[in-house]
């Protein structure tokens, strides 16, 4: 079970539109209680997304996870979806909401793509994962939201081999990997980079 979080109190509400911190915290505590009652062995991963405004919240988030028995993960906050990363990399306009996200990011798209381009020859993580939407349609990739990238309308009518072949041989995937965009979210999640940039005080634990 995975939980997404971007800070404590008002900082959480800043990057989770319409969300309320008190409700989020109460739900985390309920989840911990239900897990203890029904399935104590269930893994709960708590993902803390590092922005420029929430870095000081990390110690409280860590204490919360320790108290509830959640496994704490952390990563630099990404600009999603990859459509937006590609637009920034191409110098194209992005939405006002995406601009706001960029202003809050601790690790910029430019920094990420500089590293990702150097890793462009490394494999694409997403080729091993199939994105099936609620309507059974299959997209090229779980990280690209462009509706024109739907490969098949019904997951139940095609084989895994057909899906894999359509993605690997597609122009979209070739171009994405040639530019290194497929590595962008791996860079955002690089914990060694987080330590190197002192993004959060995790070094104190080592």
Task: Give the positions of each predicted feature.
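Iron-sulfur (Fe-S) cluster-binding modules
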Residues: 204-206
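Conserved core architecture of multi-subunit DNA-directed RNA polymerases
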Residues: 178-179
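Radical SAM enzyme [4Fe-4S]-AdoMet core and its adjacent flexible, acidic
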Residues: 1-174, 184-202
């Amino acid at each position: 079970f995975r939980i997404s979080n971007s800070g404590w109190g008002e900082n959480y509400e800043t990057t989770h539109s319409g969300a309320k911190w008190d409700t989020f915290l109460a739900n985390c505590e309920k989840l911990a209680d239900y897990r203890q009652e029904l399935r104590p062995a269930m893994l709960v991963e708590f993902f803390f997304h590092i922005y420029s405004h929430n870095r000081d919240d990390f110690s409280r988030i860590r204490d919360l996870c320790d108290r509830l028995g959640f496994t704490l993960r952390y990563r630099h906050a990404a600009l999603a979806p990859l459509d937006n990363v590609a637009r920034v990399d191409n110098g194209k306009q992005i939405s006002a909401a995406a601009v706001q996200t960029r202003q809050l990011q601790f690790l910029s798209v430019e920094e990420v793509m500089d590293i990702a381009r150097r890793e462009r020859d490394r494999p694409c993580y997403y080729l091993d994962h199939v994105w099936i939407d609620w309507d059974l349609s299959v997209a090229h990739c779980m990280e690209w939201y462009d509706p024109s990238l739907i490969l098949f309308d019904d997951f139940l009518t095609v084989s895994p081999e057909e899906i894999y072949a359509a993605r690997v041989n597609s122009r979209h995937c070739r171009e994405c990997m040639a530019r290194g965009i497929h590595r962008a979210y791996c860079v955002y999640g690089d914990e060694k980079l987080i330590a190197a940039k002192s993004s959060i005080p995790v070094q104190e634990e080592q």
